[in-house]
């Protein structure tokens, strides 16, 4: 790779091993969020249950997702992933949220960058 094309993360990887964050689903499950917690005001009237759809938290409870990122960073992670493991049309169809996939992914990226 030409020197000019190197990104800061590539430069860091050449010098050290970077630690990635952990499992978001496991972390969210440990919070014992209720259905109402998961829905928030945005999806309060949604037609199907969404508890267990941790990606939806990016829209309904972004502060919970941001806190998860902060927890991993405090624990020593160098890199955090977006909370978008199943933020695909197929993954969200179970919850009837497939029409919000773009919004989910944009929110997940926004939260991870913050």
Task: Give the label of every model feature segment.
Residues 1-114:
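Domain-level signal for soluble alpha/beta catalytic cores
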